[in-house]
Curated annotation (Swiss-Prot):
Abundant in the brain. Expressed at low levels in the aorta, uterus and intestine. It comes from Rattus norvegicus. It holds the Pfam family Na_Ca_ex. GO terms for molecular function: calcium channel activity; calcium, potassium:sodium antiporter activity; symporter activity. Keywords: Antiport, Calcium, Calcium transport, Cell membrane, Glycoprotein, Ion transport, Membrane, Phosphoprotein, Potassium, Potassium transport, Repeat, Signal, Sodium, Sodium transport, Symport, Transmembrane, Transmembrane helix, Transport. InterPro entries: K/Na/Ca-exchanger, NaCa_Exmemb, NCX_ion-bd_dom_sf. The keyword Transport applies. It catalyses: Ca(2+)(out) + K(+)(out) + 4 Na(+)(in) = Ca(2+)(in) + K(+)(in) + 4 Na(+)(out). This is Sodium/potassium/calcium exchanger 3. Residues 386-414 have a biased composition (Acidic residues).
């Protein structure tokens, strides 16, 4: 914590120094412009000044009489290609540059920005729910946030709002559709996570519709959006308590999760044990030699100790796959040791032990064994325990070796290094394609995943934030040029091209998670990130503009068609939840095809609305 505070102070002092230098430079430029203006007044005659004033007023009248929307292209630096050159084919270079910026944003966010946020959460001792609702949401939605900031403070148009709305619909319909279509299995979904995020997300979209209905946003409306996200963080803080209340109301107080109280007789017994299997090769072939562990534990519930309950919790989908695998291995070892330490065994050739202490019976109908020191086929109990201990030690060594190998593989994963080309043709092509990006990031952003750079996570956070801002600026600039060249409004480019480009990495990550059977995580992440996009991605830049930069001002929306797009966004939430409910809370190909079809309908309707097909909502873009 002390290291975190010191690094924060260092970054604050650097930011203050840069701000002071920038203010001093702007003041000098203003003084220089005043001197140049005074010299021109002395040099130019009064008649010429009157002519200039007349021209200025006429030009202002012409500008006010224009029945078109000023393009956002003029807010960026001048392009090296003319509009005619771009129409002749130079726009392809801008498309390639925009796609490269999409890839660069994905690399910076996944390999540098998110790991630094994880380190910050560890130092601040934040719970998993709060960290996921704050820092992790900011990490996955950083491109959309910076695009919105650029849309408010630079382009002063609707590209930021269009990107947020388009990305939100993409996250709900397209990501769920792709996961259902290509997951390769039917994934079960739980109702709690989906309903929790969907309900609050619906409230957020309703608030957005109310605030942008008059095509302007005031300071208090933007502040309400930010405060709604603070309430969402509080809800995530007490998510476990709210979930328990939800479970009690839906399933009743008698049904507990994970089989902790499924059998009252076993809970009341002081000498209780479970039926377990010895994970060795059985001598018979009619039945499977190994029973599934989760089926076995659910079929024969027993009173859990503290360590056993902890292991059961840590094999759920709330933990990383590596942790779940390690805890599942420990559960198998514990069950095996308990079998060997049990007091009765069958005297058959099979090594499956079945014992229910409450009834004091065994499989062949006899009572408990009178010779507790003897095991299966007369083998001494001490010998069995010694053999089990040796096998347990060997399994522990194998598990440690596997964990070491996994850690080595994790260390190898990460961004490409510019001076270490990988093996393989495909990997070499990827390395050559990303070489300029990896070269720049290698010398400017420390990789806090490496042990020797772990203490520099705040520097990683600051430098990666600057690179995300720079890449987002380049991305919006290129997309604005593409839209101006092709005659496409900025809001359509935001809903389609920018939204898909910034959300494709999240789509790929959700697909990987869904293929592992964790569809809950994929769906909840896609909907939960939309809450951050709406409330912080739009609310925070609007609040900064109307409260800090220009107090009391309004955020003007150029396109009246955005209200229809946001209305479709609200409808997509209802349709998705209703479709999941009709599909019996399962994510499969049928649900995936339906979501992708609805996403296509949304794109068609939004594009036709912005082009004034149904009604007049948008002025045409001004030419050169």
């Amino acid at each position: 914590r002390d290291l975190l505070l010191s690094q924060l102070c260092f970054l604050a002092s650097v930011a203050l120094l840069l701000w002071s230098l920038s203010s001093l430079r702007e003041q000098k430029e203003l003084d220089l412009m005043d001197l140049i203006g005074e010299d021109r007044k002395w040099m130019v005659g009064r008649k010429l000044m009157q002519v200039n004033d007349t021209l200025t007023s006429e030009d202002a009248g012409l500008r006010s009489s224009k029945n078109c929307t000023e393009p956002a292209l003029h807010e960026f630096p001048r392009d090296i290609f003319s509009n005619e050159d771009r129409r002749q084919g130079a726009v392809v270079l801008h498309v390639l540059c925009a796609m490269y910026m999409f890839y660069a944003l994905a690399i910076v966010c996944d390999d540098f920005f998110v790991p630094s946020l994880e380190k910050i959460c560890e130092r601040l001792h934040l719970s998993e729910d709060v960290a996921g609702a704050t820092f992790m949401a900011a990490g996955s939605s950083a491109p959309e946030l910076f695009t919105s900031v650029i849309g408010v403070f630079i382009t002063k148009g609707d590209v930021g709002v269009g990107t947020i709305v388009g990305s939100a619909v993409f996250n709900i319909l397209c990501i769920i559709g792709v996961c259902g279509l290509f997951a390769g299995q039917v994934v079960a979904l739980s109702s709690w996570c989906l309903l929790r995020d969907s309900i609050y997300y619906t409230l957020s979209v309703v608030a957005l519709i109310v605030f942008i209905y008059d095509e302007k946003v005031s300071w208090w409306e933007s502040l309400v959006l930010v405060l709604m996200y603070l309430i969402y963080i509080i809800i995530m803080k007490y998510n476990a308590c709210i979930h328990q209340c939800f479970e009690r109301r839906t399933k009743g107080a008698g049904n507990m999760v994970n089989g902790l109280a499924n059998n009252a007789e076993i809970d009341d017994s002081s000498n209780c044990d479970a039926t377990v299997v010895l994970l060795k090769k059985a001598n018979f072939h009619r039945k499977a030699s190994v029973i599934m562990v989760d089926e076995l534990l659910s079929a024969y519930p027993h009173q859990l100790s503290f360590s056993e309950a902890g292991l059961r919790i840590m094999i759920t989908s709330h933990f990383p796959p590596k942790t779940r695998l390690s805890m599942a291995s420990r559960m198998l070892i514990n069950e095996r040791q308990r079998l060997i330490n049990s007091r009765a065994y069958t005297n058959g050739e099979s090594e499956v032990a079945i014992k229910i202490p409450i009834k004091h019976t065994v499989e062949n109908g006899t009572g408990p064994s009178s010779a507790p020191d003897r095991g299966v086929n007369g083998t001494r109990r001490d010998d069995i325990v010694a053999e089990a201990d040796n096998e347990t030690e060997n399994e522990n060594e194998d598990e440690n070796n596997e964990n070491d190998e996994e850690e080595d593989e994790d260390d190898d994963e990460g961004p490409y290094t510019p001076f270490d080309p990988p093996s393989g043709k495909l990997e070499t092509v990827k390395w050559a394609f990303t070489w300029p990006l990896s070269f720049v990031l290698y010398f400017t952003v420390p990789n806090c995943n490496k042990p020797h750079w772990e203490k520099w996570f705040m520097v990683t956070f600051a430098s990666s934030t600057l690179w995300i801002a720079a890449f987002s600026y380049m991305m919006v600039w290129m997309v604005t040029i593409i839209g101006y060249t092709l005659g496409i409004p900025d809001v359509i480019m935001g809903i389609t091209f920018l939204a898909a480009g910034t959300s494709v990495p999240d789509c790929m990550a959700s697909l990987i998670v869904a293929r592992q059977g964790m569809g809950d995580m994929a769906v909840s992440n896609s909907i939960g990130s939309n809450v951050f996009d709406i409330l912080i991605g739009l609310g925070l830049p609007w609040a900064l503009q109307t409260l800090a930069v220009d107090y009391g001002s309004y955020i003007r929306l150029n396109s009246r068609g955005l209200i229809y797009s946001v209305g479709l966004l609200l409808a997509s939430v209802f349709v998705t939840v209703f479709g999941v409910h009709l599909n019996k809370w399962q994510l499969d190909k049928k649900l995936g095809c339906g979501c992708l079809f609805l996403y296509g309908v949304f794109l068609c309707f939004s594009i036709m609305t912005e082009f004034n097909v149904f009604t007049f909502v948008n002025l045409p873009m001004c030419g050169d």
